[in-house]
């Protein structure tokens, strides 16, 4: 017996009183709160909105951001949490290059946390698709590193993933 006690990492979701019901909000540009209000008119049961705001734009881990303060403020006024979505499919980039190099991976994490704090987001939703098999370990390392920073900043980390198939 070494006396070591492993730290506990409870999920932010453990303290929730209600089930998470998230909807994605596809953005074609910067949109303010009026766009959200129109999109949510008549919608019930949703308590988290995930706007497609952050796009990996180069192999150095830089992001293009469509985030908007008014959108977040309106969402919060409507009782919605905002989990900004980051994706890798819009620009001609190499997800493997970004995630396999410590410098670019670290920069990507820093960018995401910076924007999350600047725009007072409640979480980050990761939607990385078409990930090559050789990027698997780098992706897991990225999620580890991002999860540490999210936890330190009281941000929910959500990951979109599909059910694996024989061809994936």
Residue ranges and their predicted role:
Residues 40-46, 118-121:
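Alpha-helix termination/capping residues and helix-transition junctions
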Residues 37-43, 113, 168:
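Mature extracellular/periplasmic domains of secretome proteins
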Residues 15-30, 55-168:
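Chitinase-like catalytic core of GlcNAc-active glycosidases
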Residues 1-23, 33-42:
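Non-catalytic propeptide/linker segments at domain boundaries
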């Amino acid at each position: 017996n070494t006396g070591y006690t492993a730290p506990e990492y409870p999920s932010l979701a453990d303290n929730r009183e209600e089930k998470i019901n998230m909807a994605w909000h596809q953005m074609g540009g910067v949109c303010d709160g009026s766009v959200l209000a129109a999109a949510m008119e008549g919608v019930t049961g949703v308590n988290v909105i995930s706007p497609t705001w952050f796009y990996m734009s180069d192999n150095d881990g830089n992001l293009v951001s469509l985030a908007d303060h008014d959108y977040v403020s309106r969402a919060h006024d409507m009782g919605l949490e905002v989990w900004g979505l980051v994706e890798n499919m819009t620009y001609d980039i190499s997800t493997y290059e970004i995630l396999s190099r410590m410098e670019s991976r670290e920069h990507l994490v820093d960018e995401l946390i910076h924007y999350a704090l600047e725009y007072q987001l409640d979480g980050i939703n990761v939607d990385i698709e078409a990930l090559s098999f050789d990027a698997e370990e780098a992706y897991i390392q990225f999620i580890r590193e991002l999860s540490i920073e999210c936890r330190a900043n009281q941000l929910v980390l959500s990951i979109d993933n599909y059910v694996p198939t024989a061809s994936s």
